[in-house]
A protein has these predicted regions:
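Internal amphipathic helical hairpin motif
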Residues: 72-106, 161-189
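Conserved, structured C-terminal
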Residues: 1-25, 29-40, 112-374
Length: 374
């Protein structure tokens, strides 16, 4: 595999409000996500993982850009964009609300925050979903204002995250429910604090509403966390796979629908409101999916390489799917992977062969997830 030796910074790719802080605290690698630099490693994948599990960790996830939909038709457009029934969502509540195309394929898989009755944020995965939303709004003549607001998330992850958040922001954090959020101002810094995040661990997300305050917010949290074993980290593939969490464009894209990747629970075909892809999903619900995302376990020594593309999955020398992600889990003490397989081969306990560029790897399918949410 070829290794990237350096990243060249330029005005073409944006920096998050926490960019200087990530450099100060030792970031070693970046990727590009939503046209921004995203930290991907500090001490290494396993070391960053262990640091999180033994303390509290700050993640610069400013790359999670927001699409703000505001106006008279904000609820109607938001509902049209997702198969979730957002009318069940109240002000101060968040909801996983993927965008689908007219064939039921994934455009993006954001988390929606209901800020006001006429204002919604969609916290995006990678991709130009802002343009999709603007196009749908214009084509269907929704009366809304759509923009990317000055909002940059910072995640606080790990077993000591609640203690840190209470220490900085107050005891009300103890009463903040899962996927609930509150808008506050702390030391003149406007933020939204939510009980959510990109792992199954105890975690919070702080949505900074003034990009000039990024380093200041980081330092407030860092100073308060020095006695809580604080470290800097990034979204971690080990945590993601252990918890059965999906990554858009890595695990699913426009060629996949919710029924293939275990997200059928979020499709509400009984709601009265129409949404993009509803008829296509109704047909898929009736006929059944043709593929299914599953876990796989691989015996042997810890695998230390990462797949840079999807690897074929074989049975009897015939390709029956692909492996999307692979990692060794220290906590489970096993190699684990995501595979998406033809539906007839998607039973748990199925022996498969993963064809890597170097060799063929024997594996056995399992149901997801390996670990439940803390």
């Amino acid at each position: 595999m070829y290794k990237t030796s350096r990243v060249v910074f330029s005005p073409r790719v944006r920096k998050s409000p926490y960019f200087n802080s990530t450099l100060k605290y030792g970031v070693q690698a970046f990727s590009v996500y939503n046209h921004m630099y995203m930290p991907t490693s500090y001490e290494g994948t396993v070391e960053d993982y262990q640091n999180l599990l033994n303390g509290v960790q700050l993640w610069d996830v400013g790359v999670e850009r927001q699409v703000q939909i505001k106006g008279r038709d904000a609820e109607a457009l938001s509902q049209f964009l997702t198969p979730r029934n957002i009318k069940k969502c109240s002000k101060g509540q968040a909801m996983y609300a993927p965008f689908l195309d007219f064939k039921g394929g994934f455009i993006n898989d954001p988390v929606m925050l209901k800020i006001e009755e006429d204002c919604y944020w969609f916290s995006l995965a990678d991709g130009d979903a802002l343009l999709w939303v603007q196009g749908i709004a214009a084509g269907y003549k929704f009366d809304v204002d759509i923009r990317e607001p000055d909002v940059s998330p910072l995640q606080v992850q790990g077993p000591n995250s609640k203690e840190l958040m209470v220490k900085v922001f107050g005891d009300w954090i103890n009463d903040l429910g899962f996927y609930r959020f509150k808008e506050v101002t702390h030391k003149s810094i406007p933020i939204v604090i939510g009980r959510m995040g990109y792992s199954r661990e105890l975690c919070y997300e702080i949505f900074l509403q003034d990009h000039s305050k990024g380093d200041e917010l980081w330092e407030i949290l860092w100073e308060a966390g020095k006695d809580l074993n604080i470290s800097a980290g990034t979204p971690n593939i080990i945590l993601r796979l252990e918890g059965g969490i999906l990554s858009y464009l890595a695990d699913m894209d426009r060629t996949n629908n919710p029924y293939e990747v275990g997200l059928e629970w979020m499709v509400d075909l009984e709601q009265e409101d129409d949404f993009i892809g509803k008829e296509a999903l109704r047909e898929i619900s009736h006929s059944g999916p043709t593929k299914k995302l599953m876990g796989a376990e691989i015996a042997g020594e810890p695998i230390t390489v990462f797949n840079e593309e999807h690897w074929p999955v074989l049975i009897d020398n015939k390709t029956i799917g692909s492996m999307n992600a692979l990692v060794y889990s220290p906590r489970l003490d096993k190699n684990i992977a995501y595979v998406i397989l033809d539906i007839k081969h998607s039973k748990s306990g199925q022996e498969i062969v993963i064809s890597s560029p170097e060799k063929e790897i024997l594996a056995v399918t399992v149901d997801l997830p390996w670990l439940e949410r803390v």
